[in-house]
């Protein structure tokens, strides 16, 4: 048995080859070539082989279309097999597809609608609306495959992106145009945290957000959409702040492997054409890798470590390198990271970690204390927490906060066994301040106001630094712990303390 010879190329090389084969309009625009027709020759799950006439072979990464009774099925060219045959990845189910069906070459990669018309809408991997609210009347479409911005276009300055969330801005600040890993199990407030970030970015920076559900549960996507409508992040009658792109768990691997690029393309438009600071959420980046692994095996590539695709680092790099800051605007990415069997050395999370600028860890232990957002102040890290980037005062305050919380953590066993009375006076003071800091790191969210009844607070970075500095200096040692819980800045603490005192009298 003679196996066909595979010409597996990296996506970057394929894109360059496609550019040689297909005339381009502009830097990232494609001019559609004359449509050529082919026939389905084999269907192997999510992989479809298509044969064309001599001299009409479509370029790698081109989109092909098949008209089916259910609608249009889009295929993406992955390999040239020889004998005028291409191997393609299906973006939808291939059930009912038979040999001999007609296939047309679009002459360009998959393109999706971009612009403000996408805000408040839910779209799939090929840019079709799936929210039953009619077509998206976008004036422009962009291909999902693109090169990262050139070095001369990129901004090299390390700049903090203010989120208005105290614990993040103080202890694990986000880089403008950076990549943040969001670690959190079920029920620790990940969705609310994401919604608040979307809300705050819109308020503080006037920017938009793109939420990309990669291989997530359909129920979770539905819940997120409903919650966003309830909290006003999505406004069906007026301006919305977010576009939703979903490729759920039940989708074929081709859709799950490409849906992250669809979301990124929409975000890139807001950055490059409108000069916006865009927030891109990817939930879950592991599913992107997992889908690539499924597709790779079907394409006949020899698996590497733990069964992952041999192109794992390349695939991840092509996605992550497009998430960056340019001189026009930025795309800041928050990526939920699933760690298989809690093994951080697994190739999928290990490859992701190489690209991250900051990690935000949501802790079940902290959420059980009723402290929200349940961000672990000792486990969450950022490369921006450096005196040269954030300034000496910010760095000193953040370091002292972490040292105080760490000292409290190490004293907890002694307190549990012997009680507070056995501690030295200095340790007692440390514990009291640490407990106040712990509560002060909580914050009422605007998107949770409908549930808690507490108005949300967006706290500026300079106010956060000065507030925590005052607590560390002992200026508010006389105030009760409860006054520090679920408030914004230090003026809110004083007001709450006065209110508590008045109620007590």
Curated annotation (Swiss-Prot):
<keyword id="KW-0406">Ion transport</keyword>
<dbReference type="InterPro" id="IPR036121">
    <property type="entry name" value="ATPase_F1/V1/A1_a/bsu_N_sf"/>
</dbReference>
<dbReference type="Pfam" id="PF02874">
    <property type="entry name" value="ATP-synt_ab_N"/>
</dbReference>
<keyword id="KW-0375">Hydrogen ion transport</keyword>
<keyword id="KW-0999">Mitochondrion inner membrane</keyword>
<keyword id="KW-0066">ATP synthesis</keyword>
<keyword id="KW-0813">Transport</keyword>
<dbReference type="GO" id="GO:0042776">
    <property type="term" value="P:proton motive force-driven mitochondrial ATP synthesis"/>
</dbReference>
<protein>
    <recommendedName>
        <fullName>ATP synthase subunit beta, mitochondrial</fullName>
        <ecNumber>7.1.2.2</ecNumber>
    </recommendedName>
</protein>
<keyword id="KW-0547">Nucleotide-binding</keyword>
<dbReference type="InterPro" id="IPR024034">
    <property type="entry name" value="ATPase_F1/V1_b/a_C"/>
</dbReference>
<keyword id="KW-1278">Translocase</keyword>
<dbReference type="Pfam" id="PF00006">
    <property type="entry name" value="ATP-synt_ab"/>
</dbReference>
<dbReference type="GO" id="GO:0045259">
    <property type="term" value="C:proton-transporting ATP synthase complex"/>
</dbReference>
<dbReference type="InterPro" id="IPR000194">
    <property type="entry name" value="ATPase_F1/V1/A1_a/bsu_nucl-bd"/>
</dbReference>
<dbReference type="GO" id="GO:0005524">
    <property type="term" value="F:ATP binding"/>
</dbReference>
<dbReference type="InterPro" id="IPR005722">
    <property type="entry name" value="ATP_synth_F1_bsu"/>
</dbReference>
<dbReference type="InterPro" id="IPR003593">
    <property type="entry name" value="AAA+_ATPase"/>
</dbReference>
<dbReference type="Pfam" id="PF22919">
    <property type="entry name" value="ATP-synt_VA_C"/>
</dbReference>
<keyword id="KW-0496">Mitochondrion</keyword>
<dbReference type="GO" id="GO:0005743">
    <property type="term" value="C:mitochondrial inner membrane"/>
</dbReference>
<keyword id="KW-0139">CF(1)</keyword>
<dbReference type="InterPro" id="IPR055190">
    <property type="entry name" value="ATP-synt_VA_C"/>
</dbReference>
<dbReference type="InterPro" id="IPR027417">
    <property type="entry name" value="P-loop_NTPase"/>
</dbReference>
<dbReference type="GO" id="GO:0046933">
    <property type="term" value="F:proton-transporting ATP synthase activity, rotational mechanism"/>
</dbReference>
<comment type="function">
    <text>Mitochondrial membrane ATP synthase (F(1)F(0) ATP synthase or Complex V) produces ATP from ADP in the presence of a proton gradient across the membrane which is generated by electron transport complexes of the respiratory chain. F-type ATPases consist of two structural domains, F(1) - containing the extramembraneous catalytic core, and F(0) - containing the membrane proton channel, linked together by a central stalk and a peripheral stalk. During catalysis, ATP synthesis in the catalytic domain of F(1) is coupled via a rotary mechanism of the central stalk subunits to proton translocation.</text>
</comment>
<feature type="binding site">
    <location>
        <begin position="184"/>
        <end position="191"/>
    </location>
    <ligand>
        <name>ATP</name>
    </ligand>
</feature>
<keyword id="KW-0809">Transit peptide</keyword>
<dbReference type="InterPro" id="IPR004100">
    <property type="entry name" value="ATPase_F1/V1/A1_a/bsu_N"/>
</dbReference>
<dbReference type="InterPro" id="IPR050053">
    <property type="entry name" value="ATPase_alpha/beta_chains"/>
</dbReference>
<dbReference type="GO" id="GO:0016887">
    <property type="term" value="F:ATP hydrolysis activity"/>
</dbReference>
<keyword id="KW-0067">ATP-binding</keyword>
<comment type="subunit">
    <text>F-type ATPases have 2 components, CF(1) - the catalytic core - and CF(0) - the membrane proton channel. CF(1) has five subunits: alpha(3), beta(3), gamma(1), delta(1), epsilon(1). CF(0) has three main subunits: a, b and c.</text>
</comment>
<dbReference type="InterPro" id="IPR020003">
    <property type="entry name" value="ATPase_a/bsu_AS"/>
</dbReference>
<comment type="similarity">
    <text>Belongs to the ATPase alpha/beta chains family.</text>
</comment>
<keyword id="KW-0472">Membrane</keyword>
């Amino acid at each position: 048995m003679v196996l066909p010879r595979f010409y597996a190329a990296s996506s970057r090389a394929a894109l360059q080859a496609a550019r040689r084969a297909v005339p381009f309009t502009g830097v990232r625009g494609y001019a559609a070539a004359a449509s050529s027709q082919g026939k389905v020759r084999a269907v192997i799950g999510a992989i479809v082989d298509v044969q064309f006439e001599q001299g009409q072979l479509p370029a790698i990464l081109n989109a092909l279309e098949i008209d089916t009774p259910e609608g249009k099925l889009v295929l993406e060219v992955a390999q040239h097999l020889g004998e005028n045959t291409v191997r393609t990845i299906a973006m939808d189910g291939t059930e009912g597809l038979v040999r001999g069906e007609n296939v047309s070459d679009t002459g360009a990669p998959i393109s999706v609608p971009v612009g403000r018309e996408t805000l408040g809408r839910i779209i799939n991997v090929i840019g079709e609306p799936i929210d039953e609210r009619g077509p998206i009347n976008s004036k422009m479409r962009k291909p999902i495959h693109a090169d990262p911005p050139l070095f001369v276009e990129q901004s090299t300055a390390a700049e903090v992106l203010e989120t208005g969330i105290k614990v993040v801005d103080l202890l694990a600040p986000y880089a403008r145009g950076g990549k943040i890993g969001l670690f959190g199990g079920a029920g620790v407030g990940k969705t609310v945290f994401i919604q608040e970030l979307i809300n705050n970015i819109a308020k503080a920076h006037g920017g938009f957000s793109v939420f990309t559900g990669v291989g997530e549960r359909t129920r979770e996507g539905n819940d997120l959409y409903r919650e966003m409508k309830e909290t006003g992040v999505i406004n069906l009658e007026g301006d919305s702040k977010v576009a939703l792109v979903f490729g759920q768990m039940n989708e074929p691997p081709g859709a799950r492997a490409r849906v992250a690029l669809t979301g990124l393309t929409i975000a890139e438009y807001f950055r490059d054409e409108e000069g916006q600071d865009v927030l891109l959420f990817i939930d879950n980046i592991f599913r992107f890798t997992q889908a690539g692994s499924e597709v790779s095996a079907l394409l006949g590539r020899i698996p590497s470590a733990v069964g992952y695709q041999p192109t794992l680092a390349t695939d991840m790099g092509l996605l992550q390198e497009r998430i960056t800051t340019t001189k026009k605007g930025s795309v800041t990415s928050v990526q939920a990271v699933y760690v298989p069997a809690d093994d951080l050395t697994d190739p999928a999370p290990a490859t992701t970690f190489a690209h991250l600028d900051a990690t935000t860890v949501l802790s079940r232990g902290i959420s059980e204390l009723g402290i929200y957002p349940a961000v672990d102040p000792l486990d969450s890290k950022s490369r921006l927490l450096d005196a040269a980037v954030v300034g000496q005062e910010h760095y000193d305050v953040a370091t002292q906060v972490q040292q105080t919380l760490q000292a409290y953590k190490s004293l907890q066993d002694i307190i549990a066994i012997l009680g507070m009375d056995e501690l030295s006076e200095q340790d007692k003071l440390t514990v009291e301040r640490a407990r106040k800091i712990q509560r002060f790191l909580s914050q009422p969210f605007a998107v949770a106001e409908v549930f808690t009844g507490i108005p949300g607070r967006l706290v500026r970075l300079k106010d956060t630094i000065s507030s925590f500095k005052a607590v560390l200096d002992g200026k508010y040692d006389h105030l009760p712990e409860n006054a520090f819980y679920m408030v914004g800045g230090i003026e809110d603490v004083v007001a709450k303390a006065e209110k508590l005192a008045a109620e007590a009298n």
